[in-house]
Amino acid sequence: MGLPWYRVHTVVLNDPGRLLAVHIMHTALVSGWAGSMALYELAVFDPSDPVLDPMWRQGMFVIPFMTRLGITDSWGGWSISGGTVTNPGIWSYEGVAGAHIVFSGLCFLAAIWHWVYWDLAIFSDDRTGKPSLDLPKIFGIHLFLAGVACFGFGAFHVTGLYGPGIWVSDPYGLTGKVQAVNPAWGAEGFDPFVPGGIASHHIAAGTLGILAGLFHLSVRPPQRLYKGLRMGNIETVLSSSIAAVFFAAFVVAGTMWYGSATTPIELFGPTRYQWDQGYFQQEIYRRVSNGLAENLSLSEAWSKIPEKLAFYDYIGNNPAKGGLFRAGSMDNGDGIAVGWLGHPVFRDKEGRELFVRRMPTFFETFPVVLVDEEGIVRADVPFRRAESKYSVEQVGVTVEFYGGELNGVSYSDPATVKKYARRSQLGEIFELDRATLKSDGVFRSSPRGWFTFGHATFALLFFFGHIWHGARTLFRDVFAGIDPDLDAQVEFGTFQKVGDPTTRKQAV
């Protein structure tokens, strides 16, 4: 049977045993990929510096998902938070990866068994002797089981009742750890940044799924609805399943790109909007102001800023700075961060503090402009020196560092001042090692960007798949050229034109 590539899946039409087999094999492939990818990432992951070289800077993709579900320790003796562990047990990164690979192997064997033993009695209709599936009943079974799993995850795993809890952190991604979460049943549960909503929504959705599953198991669909929605056709199942998948993909693309409690910045990196809104910059200035109010010196106030917080306030960690075809991790772009140089404070010769205007997300280059606290331009690095009025040399700009490696160091040399002014456009200034990985200096996106791009793209493709298969199943009679209300038996050769009673052949 010579089928074109886009029609090969018709071989499992009207063949429930082999339809089951190919789905089990698909599960084997997905689980096997997840386990293998986890082992590869663990082989290349460097856990030595969770502050300046976290998993998202290294381009890890599956490790963050394991971590947010409660896995933090490795058989290699390290913990994701930077400590050491002696007995991580079976539920370590390697243990979970191994479990997926073992499960993949079992699914592989099950798929082969079901492919060979496809003609099982359970798939046969007693009345006709032909293969058939009771699709409404199967829908009820799956809905019930999915509801049980959903409820169990929310009520036991997330709450810590029987499980580790989930990754929870503060709004600035500094104190993250795995902990039990109490369900949030009030209005706050609808805030996408409240972890309690994850528990309560899984409990509620799971309960609804269990009840809906029992309903569909005990109540048969009305005949008109059954026929109208083509509930006896397996392509209806395909169409509605694709709809569920593309809807979920669109939702998670949104929660990943815009941020939520399910996508902590410690695991996936900051969002672009945190750079656009100066989110971390405001928090840093708030902490420094509080320090000054407590009679700390400027140097002491800046020295109390966590290096982790300063690192978030750097444009190289903005997932929107990567290019679509720039493969590789962030570390392969601007390099591995080694240390924070400190916060540069610029002043003109009149003693005014100047602030470098930061580069917007979608600019590759941006003029170096220094403004005072009222937003008035006081200095710049001019394009045409002959016409300049505000050059660093003319204005007499100096720079002094507070906190970090250059704490207390000041420069008045114009070339050095301009160098640090340019680097201040990109946020806080870090020493970056570009030699180790031969980093090319071109920004890359974080796993947050890759996940969003992948899921939004496939969601769009699956949306068209839903429309395609939905139309095929709803208008199957139209495409086949047969009127569903035709009373006469349609047999080959009865009519000159198939299904047209006006062309009935006369028996000779």
From Swiss-Prot:
It comes from Lolium perenne. Binds multiple chlorophylls. PSII binds additional chlorophylls, carotenoids and specific lipids. The keyword Flavoprotein does not apply. Its main location: plastid. GO terms for cellular component: chloroplast thylakoid membrane; photosystem II. One of the components of the core complex of photosystem II (PSII). It binds chlorophyll and helps catalyze the primary light-induced photochemical processes of PSII. PSII is a light-driven water:plastoquinone oxidoreductase, using light energy to abstract electrons from H(2)O, generating O(2) and a proton gradient subsequently used for ATP formation. InterPro entries: PS_antenna-like, PS_II_antenna-like_sf, PSII_PsbB. This is Photosystem II CP47 reaction center protein. The chain crosses the membrane at residues 21-36, 101-115, 140-156, 203-218, 237-252, 457-472. It comes from the Eukaryota. It is a multi-pass membrane protein. Belongs to the PsbB/PsbC family. PsbB subfamily.
